[in-house]
Design a protein with these regions (language model features):
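Acidic, metal/ion-coordinating pockets
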Residues: 1-154
Length: 154
C-alpha cells in the first residue's frame, strides 16, 4: 500500500482477495505500547478492508488486539537483534506470531485462530539463540513473564 490513504484500494469487499494483510513499519522504538497515532492507523487500515496487520519497527513486543474483525499485532520485537551492542533485556524479548487462516468454504480467508510464541534472545560465546520463555529459569524468567503479562494481560 502507498503512504497516502487516498491511493489505497477502495473495494474492501473484493471477493478475489481472501485476506488482505498489511505489514506497516510504524510506531516509536522501544515502547511496549502503541502510540495513539499507530492505533488510529490500525483502525484506518481495518476500515480499508485489511484483515491482518503485523507491525514492526518498535524493536520490542507490543500488544495483539482485535480492531473490529481485523487482527492487529502491533510489534513482534526483534528476531535477530538491533544495531545496539548492549541491548537492554526488555528489547531481547520477541515473539513468533502464528495465524491460522480458514480455507473452508464460506469462511475462506477468515482468521480461525492465532498464537504468540514469546522468546528471549540470549547471548553466549558471541552468538545469540532464541529461547522459549517457558524454558527460561531463575529471576530472568520471572522478569520476562511479568513484562509479558503487562503487555498482553493474563
Amino acid at each position: 500500500m502507498r503512504s497516502d490513504p487516498a491511493a489505497w484500494p477502495k473495494d474492501a469487499a473484493d471477493k478475489s482477495i481472501d485476506l488482505r494483510c498489511a505489514i506497516p513499519h510504524w510506531d516509536w522504538e522501544f515502547r511496549h505500547f502503541p502510540h495513539p497515532q499507530t492505533q488510529a492507523l490500525a483502525r484506518l487500515l481495518a476500515a480499508h478492508g485489511v484483515g491482518l496487520i503485523a507491525g514492526h519497527h518498535a524493536h520490542v513486543v507490543q500488544p495483539v488486539q482485535w480492531v473490529g474483525k481485523t487482527l492487529v499485532a502491533y510489534g513482534l520485537g526483534d528476531f535477530l537483534g538491533t544495531a545496539l551492542a548492549r541491548q537492554p533485556w526488555p528489547g531481547r524479548i520477541g515473539g513468533i506470531f502464528v495465524v491460522d487462516v480458514s480455507a473452508d468454504l464460506g469462511k475462506r480467508g477468515t482468521i480461525a485462530g492465532y498464537r504468540m510464541y514469546p522468546f528471549m534472545r540470549l547471548g553466549a560465546g558471541g552468538h545469540e539463540r532464541l529461547v522459549p520463555v517457558e524454558a527460561l529459569s531463575g529471576p530472568m524468567k520471572g522478569k520476562v513473564e511479568a513484562r509479558l503479562r503487562a503487555i498482553f494481560g493474563d
